[in-house]
Design a protein with these regions (language model features):
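Hydrophobic/aromatic beta-strand patches that form the interior of the parallel beta-sheet core
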Residues: 10-14, 80, 107, 129-133, ...
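C-terminal active-site/capping subdomain that shapes the small-molecule cofactor and substrate pocket
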Residues: 120, 125-197
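Short, charged, surface-exposed secondary-structure boundary motifs
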Residues: 20-26, 116-119, 171
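Short beta->alpha junction loops
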Residues: 15-17, 111-112, 161-167
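Short glycine/serine/threonine/alanine-rich loop segments
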Residues: 9, 103-104, 157, 192
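Glycine-rich phosphate-binding loops that contact phosphosugars or nucleotide phosphates
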Residues: 1-60, 72, 135-159
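Active-site phosphate/pyrophosphate-binding segments
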Residues: 36-129
Length: 201
């Protein structure tokens, strides 16, 4: 801090003592500002739009409830999030939340890279909850999602395709918020303490 001040350089101060999983808006918002500065872009307007979205979160919570309704009877089973590249980080975060909050298992498969693995591994019914996150950016990847969804649903697997419209920061924050709720409700149903995470407590 003193070095930055001595050279009149901007710097960011991050408050200590918070668990990152409890302050994702703060943490991701700070990272967005830093990356924006490195790229020479002012991200404050975009972050204000996201903040405004969260001031009226009813639509996101409704989407989370819809997703929860799909998985409620199988909530204790493992989750596999099938995503495209744009949503890989969001998928990983949800799996971390399922592991930390609900003490469950979560795995990520990225299409098209894991396309063959998915098809070879899932040609039967599994005790698995599948969530699809596809930005729709690539026509060939879209076709893979469609095919895989058909395979899984025809075999009786539970699949929820989250209706993301694009890969924007706004959409990604929305999906994070909705899936965070899902992980909390999963912890409630499993009667586990979502505040107790042994490895970080």
């Amino acid at each position: 801090k003193s070095l930055a001040e001595n050279h009149s350089l901007p710097y960011y101060s991050v408050a200590l003592g918070y668990q990152p999983r409890m302050t994702w808006g703060f943490g991701l918002g700070t990272l967005v500002m830093i990356l924006g500065e490195l790229m020479g872009k002012d991200m404050s307007g975009r972050l204000r739009d996201i903040e405004a979205m969260f001031k009226s979160p009813e639509a996101i919570v409704a989407r989370a409830k819809e997703m929860y309704g799909v998985f409620q009877s199988t909530i204790a089973q493992k989750f596999v999030v099938v995503c495209d590249l744009a949503y890989e980080a969001v998928a990983i975060r949800f799996c971390q939340q399922i592991q930390e909050n609900a003490k469950g298992e979560g795995f990520v498969s990225v299409l098209p890279e894991a396309n063959h693995n998915m098809i070879e591994s899932y040609y039967e019914k599994h005790d698995t909850n599948f969530i699809f996150l596809n930005s729709g950016k690539n026509v060939r990847v879209n076709a893979r999602f469609d095919f895989l969804k058909g395979v899984l649903t025809d075999l009786g697997n539970t699949v929820y395709q989250y209706p993301v419209s694009d890969a924007s920061l706004m959409s990604q924050f929305e999906v994070i918020h909705a899936t965070d709720w899902l992980s909390i409700w999963a912890s409630d149903d499993k009667k586990v303490d979502n505040m107790q995470v042994g490895i970080i407590m």
